[in-house]
Design a protein with these regions (language model features):
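Juxtamembrane/interface and other helix-to-disorder boundary residues
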Residues: 1-95, 191-202, 254-304
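Soluble non-cytosolic domains of exported or imported proteins
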Residues: 32, 154-158, 190
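Active-site recognition of the HExxH zinc-binding catalytic motif
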Residues: 34, 158-174
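Short pre-active-site segment immediately N-terminal to the catalytic Zn-binding motif
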Residues: 146-162
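Short, solvent-exposed secondary-structure capping/transition elements
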Residues: 154-156, 171-183
């Protein structure tokens, strides 16, 4: 069955990109430890463009200041702003960027122009021949749309994962900006989509401090966009909350965790659980090694 690039392809997570192509280069940079690696490896250009939609279309451009505010709230070492329609950043001296910041810096500085055409919850997809009937679900690859209502409605992890996903997807596609509205092959969409999923996984690995997190299901249902699993057998889900009433048309991304024992947890609670278990494991290792004290919370305490 042919996959329309406007929609996500569950099989895409199985696609692999060639290790030395543009997409692989982007992913390698996104995995780098900080801004210096990004800056030294790529030409410094401002390549993410925030654009309005065309005349007569449903515009989300009025909410762009909220997008910039949200981006800054999630970027402790960066200051984001628009210069014209280009998204630019300034880094705080001697700061260490988070994984999200590192990925975003790499995307700003890669070679492709990445347009974000800001529509809203009322924007529709289709054509003049058959009509416009399909809502934009987060983003739309072929048209370059970004539903800013969907993006801003997400929780912090959901916002970050959706943003790096579609920007990575677009960055992996040759001459993306010039081809908006044209034809994209299933293979190139699948390649970018797979890299976008990996970019999401990187956000989760950094947040939970767990390198074992891997994708196991792509769009298994209308309200579950991704399912990741770690070596403990716990599942991390990016869920979609479908808006009702005044929020009809808003698809908000949020993240939760379902443990192997089927306990549903918030990301913060689950991260705290992992940290407690790591501390307990450290204490046990030190005890077995004959230590009389160990470090906990930055201070020395007697070993049990």
């Amino acid at each position: 069955m042919h996959v329309r690039p406007e929609h996500e392809a569950p099989a895409a997570s199985r696609e692999r990109a060639a290790p030395l192509d543009r997409a692989g280069r982007i992913l390698s940079l996104q995995r780098s430890a900080g801004n210096r690696a990004v800056m030294s490896a790529l030409r410094i250009d401002r390549k993410i463009e925030v654009r309005d939609v065309g005349r007569g279309e449903q515009s989300g451009f009025a909410r762009v200041p909220e997008f910039i505010e949200r981006l800054n709230g999630l970027s402790p070492s960066l200051n984001w702003k628009l210069e014209g329609r280009e998204l630019v950043f300034e880094q705080t001296p001697d700061s260490t960027p988070t994984n999200f910041e590192t990925q975003m810096m790499a995307l700003v500085n890669q070679e492709n122009v990445l347009p974000m055409r800001m529509t809203n919850r009322h924007g529709l997809l289709g054509d003049k021949a058959s009509g416009f009937h399909d809502s934009v679900d987060g983003d739309a690859f072929t048209s370059g749309y970004v539903d800013i209502d969907d993006l801003l409605a997400g929780d912090d992890l959901g916002f970050q994962m959706l943003l790096v996903h579609f920007l990575t997807e677009r960055a992996a596609t040759s001459n993306y900006a010039r081809r908006i509205g044209g034809n994209f092959s299933e293979a190139e969409f699948n390649r970018g989509h797979s890299l976008g999923i990996e970019a999401e996984a990187e956000i989760l690995r950094a947040f939970f401090g767990d390198p074992s997190i891997r994708i196991v299901a792509d769009s298994p249902s209308v309200t579950v966009r991704r399912v990741f699993r770690n070596s403990r057998g716990d599942r991390i889900r990016r869920r979609i909350r479908l808006g009702r009433g005044e929020e009809t048309g808003v698809n908000a991304s949020s993240v939760d965790v379902v443990t192997a024992g089927n306990i549903v947890m918030t990301p913060d609670d689950y991260r705290a659980l992992l940290e407690r278990e790591r501390t307990a494991a450290q204490v046990e290792r030190e005890r077995l090694g004959g230590a009389t004290e160990h470090r906990e919370g930055g201070r020395s305490v007697p070993a049990p």
